[in-house]
Amino acid sequence: MVLQKSGSRNEEQVKVRGFDSRQVPVYFDGVPIYVPYDGNLDLARILTNNLGAVEVSKGYSSLLQGPNQMGGAINITTQKPTKPLEASLGYRQGWSRSQDNAYDMHASFAASSDLGYLQVSGSQLKQDFLGLPHGVNNDIAGKHGKMINSSADDKRGIVKLGFTPRENDEYTLTYIKQDGEKDNPPYSGNSGQKITLLAVARV
């Protein structure tokens, strides 16, 4: 499995055994998520707090999940409450070149019983700029340690209602509202290849 940023929109995408997101659909709690225009998805827009697991199916996958699973499927699941009452609140601050450039804040509340659970959560990740290395100071990449057109702002809210009448049965109703905005910095290199490999993982 390979994560990379590519394309004119500089989107983070995943490839499984050479297949991209059009042959390896991404699901969020079992619901497919993609852009109808071209079938792709910017994975960098998915906030990671309140996530329980990332399930990767390579090769054969269930037909109940729908079409376009030539290379497999990826299912991102949210956490479920394990206590009668749960609450969390978090804040993280990012720094670059001695300047605050980003922050991440999130809050969640959950209640559960033998019959089911209710979970409400919200989060925001805002980035003002990406830092540049020392010595980089030009009109294309950026000046004063700030890459131009590199800001991003993502917000997400989730309401999840679960019903567990028996030990092995679970029925959930999930509402997700997510808004995301990002700028696209210009390419400042001297090569026509615009793909940057970020990570390689074996599953």
What are the functions of these language-model segments?
Residues 6, 66-68, 94-103:
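Solvent-exposed loop/turn segments connecting transmembrane beta-strands
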Residues 12, 70-72, 103-107, 155-159, ...:
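Hydrophobic, lipid-facing positions within transmembrane beta-strands of outer-membrane proteins
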Residues 15, 31-59:
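Short acidic/polar hinge/loop motifs at secondary-structure boundaries
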Residues 83-85, 90-98, 108-193:
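Periplasmic-side early beta-strands and strand-to-turn transitions of outer-membrane beta-barrels
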Residues 1-31, 52:
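Extracytoplasmic beta-strand/coil segments of soluble accessory domains associated
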Residues 1, 54-56, 74-76:
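Non-catalytic regulatory/gating segments with a bias toward low-complexity or hydrophobic composition
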Residues 18-20, 28-30, 58, 78-80, ...:
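Flexible glycine-/small-residue-rich
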Residues 10-12, 22-24, 42, 50-52, ...:
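Envelope-exposed proteins and targeting segments
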